[in-house]
Amino acid sequence: MDDNNSDWTSYDFGNDTIPSPNEISLSHIGTRHWITLVCYGIVFLLGVPGNALVVWVTGFRMPNSVNAQWFLNLAIADLLCCLSLPILMVPLAQDQHWPFGALACKLFSGIFYMMMYCSVLLLVVISLDRFLLVTKPVWCQNNRQPRQARILCFIIWILGLLGSSPYFAHMEIQHHSETKTVCTGSYSSLGHAWAITIIRSFLFFLLPFLIICISHWKVYHMTSSGRRQRDKSSRTLRVILALVLGFFLCWTPLHIVDLLILVSDQPSERFEVNLNLAHVLTLCLAYINSCLNPLLYVCLGRGFKENLISSLRSVLHFASEAPTHGPSMTTNSKSTTDGVFREKPV
């Protein structure tokens, strides 16, 4: 159960309620709590411009291609996820008090996890696509088209919506006092909470992680098998390690903490405070993955940095010239972005 602002550890089980870490004042956390807010702010400041830049380059400064569709949708999902941070930081700075009402509680929680799930699924699709480019090059040349990529991206958004449906359905506000309202998840039984946690961890973490690892390992193995390719194998290995470690390190702690929350039935007050802090910090790590994606999946791609610089120069050139020079700038810019994403694996 993931939520940085709402208490996903407080489930309504009829007459039995798991103690809520949010019922313990965050003033006990002190400096660490504000450090967490600073971390969230840094993620916002890095993730928003980074992903917005990728959206701009892939959506407006390069030709339509399969890779462009992958990275455009990935950047949109990560951008929307990062844009939600300021709203979700408000309760964190107010002792978990949710001031936005019941509808916003459901919408912000559900949409946030929808974006995260779409991001994970897109990483899987990118890995499988690179695997097919290496193992089935002829098939990809005949069947790999931007139209199919757009359809698959649409399906991914639908799957992300379905995966986040428990958050839309079970998030609600609870009044802890006259001045404090908490956005929390309410379930009918502990078994129900366990089922959702296990299914989510398998479908949106364990299975994607295995697919990403196997796909990239196969890509590395095949691209380094020939003598002419060995010079590039070390760079390929570095990129693959960055991709796999980035995904693993950003997502594993969150799922471990989620399981600890369910296992710890009646923890001590000190343990509850530490567990709540750990949950917030591991959510920050998951957010960091949204910052790393543009760097790992785009900036390490062939030709992206050169074409990004070229596009920025074109914009500056356009801004400094008269409007009559606009068409020539557009034509030149178009020609410089043809190689942003080559239809080959890294």
Curated annotation (Swiss-Prot):
Recorded family membership: Belongs to the G-protein coupled receptor 1 family.
UniProt-recorded name of the protein: C5a anaphylatoxin chemotactic receptor 1
One function term, GO molecular function aspect: complement component C5a receptor activity
Region (Disordered): 323-346
Gene Ontology CC annotations of this record: apical part of cell; basolateral plasma membrane; plasma membrane
SUPFAM superfamilies: Family A G protein-coupled receptor-like
InterPro entries named among the record's database cross-references: Formyl_rcpt-rel, GPCR_Rhodpsn, GPCR_Rhodpsn_7TM
Protein's cellular compartments: Cell membrane
Biological-process GO terms, alphabetical: chemotaxis; complement receptor mediated signaling pathway; inflammatory response; mRNA transcription by RNA polymerase II; phospholipase C-activating G protein-coupled receptor signaling pathway; positive regulation of cytosolic calcium ion concentration; positive regulation of epithelial cell proliferation; positive regulation of ERK1 and ERK2 cascade
Transmembrane among keywords: yes
Disulfide bonds: 105-183
Extracellular topological domain: 1-33, 90-106, 171-194, 262-279
Transmembrane spans: 34-60, 66-89, 107-128, 150-170, 195-220, 239-261, 280-300
Record's bilayer topology term: Multi-pass membrane protein
Biased segments, Polar residues type: 327-338
Signal sequence extent: none
